[in-house]
Amino acid sequence: MPRSALLCCLILLAGVAASRDQGTQSENSCAHFPASLPHMLRELRAAFGRVKTFFQMKDQLDNMLLTRSLLEDFKGYLGCQALSEMIQFYLEEVMPQAENHGPDIKEHVNSLGEKLKTLRLRLRRCHRFLPCENKSKAVEQVRGVFSKLQEKGVYKAMSEFDIFINYIEAYMTMKMKN
């Protein structure tokens, strides 16, 4: 066998071994994910606690944005998609507007957003927790109401962020039992 062919084979085998080891690391982090979830949810709740009073004081609306139908979607066959869409909704629509309420609020909302991004990244790496494609009607309803509320929608969505964390917890608890 020529040296160049032998060298190519060795490089290929090294690449396959490295790839397999990386897959094992990813699987290991997924194995530990259920144990780290309570800590991640506590961090989300603590980060939200820094802005909760501000947004709940500004929320003058009596109706709920995050309704029971959203929780039912989280618990049903659309749970994965509902969770994915709601994380995207908060990161792309709610939090950018929520950051416009002063430097202190911006800092805390930004921190909350980073923790939510970390959760989303961990969920995506562990495909059994976020393997989805379908659209959730309940999330579409939340988005529609949020848009109609205009500026008040930010106060409403941020004031109910703790409900969103509870829905995440309900979804993840259900997935870990399966």
From Swiss-Prot:
SUPFAM superfamilies: 4-helical cytokines. Glycans are attached at N134. Transmembrane segments: none annotated. It is found in: Secreted. Its main location: secreted. It comes from the Eukaryota. GO terms for molecular function: cytokine activity. One of its GO terms (biological process) is response to glucocorticoid. Gene3D superfamilies: 1.20.1250.10. The keyword Ion transport does not apply. InterPro entries: 4_helix_cytokine-like_core (IPR009079), IL-10 (IPR000098), IL-10/19/20/24/26 (IPR020443), IL-10_CS (IPR020423). Disulfide bonds join C30-C126, C80-C132. Keywords: Cytokine, Disulfide bond, Glycoprotein, Secreted, Signal. Pfam families: IL10. The keyword Glycoprotein applies. GO terms for cellular component: extracellular space. Residues 1-18 form the signal peptide. Homodimer. Interacts with IL10RA and IL10RB. Major immune regulatory cytokine that acts on many cells of the immune system where it has profound anti-inflammatory functions, limiting excessive tissue disruption caused by inflammation. Mechanistically, IL10 binds to its heterotetrameric receptor comprising IL10RA and IL10RB leading to JAK1 and STAT2-mediated phosphorylation of STAT3. In turn, STAT3 translocates to the nucleus where it drives expression of anti-inflammatory mediators. Belongs to the IL-10 family. This is Interleukin-10. The lineage of its organism: Eukaryota, Metazoa, Chordata, Craniata, Vertebrata.
